[in-house]
């Protein structure tokens, strides 16, 4: 083969991510060189040309190697970025975990480069036997040419191939060094971020613990700020203060729950562990703050309910209190309202009673019998009544008090002893009343022990230091009705109250009720045939140091007064008493109202008994009751309720007046009546009904 027939190989730079191939390759132009030409003895004729070709190819190879080395770091890190992108890692790591994921990519690439390097180094070596081969290659090549006297082509291709391997190994080693440094830098950065995260987490935890220890203080401070932002109340009542405080706490809870919802969203979308921990701690603190506020709200609600109950009880007490001055005069008073005005003045009423007693005494002296002498008429002012009220005297609960001695109370009777024994004292005269049309007539009636009982119960009044009043409590004869309270306002504190050492309570004067008027009438005796229905009356004794003489009190409660049933009730179907535990209660069935309407009952107890007897005898309604309840109902008792609807000892259905009797509601108006369970009855009254 002629020298001029030689074709040099080509340089190929291959960018491979650890595939085991050379980064720089030399590809010979031919794989066989044939039979070299005859070389005569003497110096080799190929040395000069061979060296020229070597230097030419070596220059190209060195330049390629130099270019790769110059941009090697950028290219290597670019490989890392490409691998991160393929793995779905963020372009810029912000957390220690992200950095460690990036480090794993770097370490994997470094391992791949090391495998490629090992693949090069494990190939059968011809000339490439030492790391300094690139420096020795030219001299080795020249020596081979001089020694062999062969054609240079084969030697040249072998040297170029080995140099390409050496340069590839150098590139891999440089990349491995770059990746190793990068890996270490990432490790250091990850550790730094982890240390910073631990420090930040410790700060967050310390802040959380401090805030948790001061939840109550923070909650109170926020409530104070919210309260200060509102218009200030001037001399607020406890009820106003409770209302304001309840509003503040309720709003604070609503605000905290909004924050709670937003914070829960942060937990779900937290960008890193630290932010998630912050949100988790905030969630716990919000739970504590809401619990603190709820505890406050519970206390406020409990106090509000307590005060409402006190006010309700006070209202019930006031509505059932007969207030009178203890000045020895004759007075009439309406329950919960005040003194009933006397048309011609209080003195005229006292004189009318005295005249009636005198007339009755004269009549009895000449012809002993049951006689009554009217002394006053009670009329009800319709202008003060609402449309739903019964505009008759029957709706007025009143009491009349007078000196018991005028009705014949013996001065020698030990009232205290009689009262302790729950005893009675016989009186020759008592007071009574009778409704006649729009007027109620008050009379003095003689007693005979048969038609008119002589015995009058005795009670002792007790001084209430809190109110400054003398009081007597009269239990109601109806289970669901509150007791009656009789009070007397003394002219001065009792003798054992020392004004010099204590400040006596000054009770308020008894107000005047303008809804009714007492008009004295001329004393006219009348004979009473049969049995007279008497209202409740008592003889009230007072402590010796009170200076108050015994008082006879006649009081009238509409429940204890005869009356006719009115109203139509309502049609009912299905489980009638199923509504007794809900809402207003179960209405009076219209078929029962039809049976009772127009009938006269001697008192409320009589009406109740007749009502339940009528229900028990109704062919449809009676099917809703068990044999035990039916047996009780046929005797005039109310049916039993299930245990969950009972209240203490109250275990039977009760009848409730929707419009209170004290407010003018009809006692026997069946449109004003509903059947309720004891539990529901209590709930209705707690609601102020």
Curated annotation (Swiss-Prot):
SMART domains documented for this protein: HNHc (SM00507)
Signal peptide: none
Record keyword Ribonucleoprotein present: no
Protein's UniProt keywords contain Hydrolase: yes
Keywords of this entry: Antibiotic, Antimicrobial, Bacteriocin, Endonuclease, Hydrolase, Metal-binding, Nuclease, Zinc
Annotated positions binding Zn(2+): 656, 681, 685
Enzyme class: hydrolase
Molecular functions (GO terms): endonuclease activity; metal ion binding; signaling receptor binding
GO BP terms, alphabetized: cytolysis; defense response to bacterium; killing of cells of another organism
Entry's EC annotation: 3.1.-.-
Entries under Pfam families matching the protein: Col-Pyo_DNase (PF21431), Pyocin_S (PF06958)
Subunit text: Purified pyocin S2 makes up a complex of the two (large and small) proteins. The large protein, but not the pyocin complex, shows in vitro DNase activity.
Function of the protein: Causes breakdown of chromosomal DNA as well as complete inhibition of lipid synthesis in sensitive cells.
Note: Pyocins contain N-terminal receptor-binding domain, translocation domain and C-terminal DNase domain.
Family note: Belongs to the colicin/pyosin nuclease family.
Protein name per its UniProtKB record: Pyocin-S2
Organism from which the protein derives: Pseudomonas aeruginosa (strain ATCC 15692 / DSM 22644 / CIP 104116 / JCM 14847 / LMG 12228 / 1C / PRS 101 / PAO1)
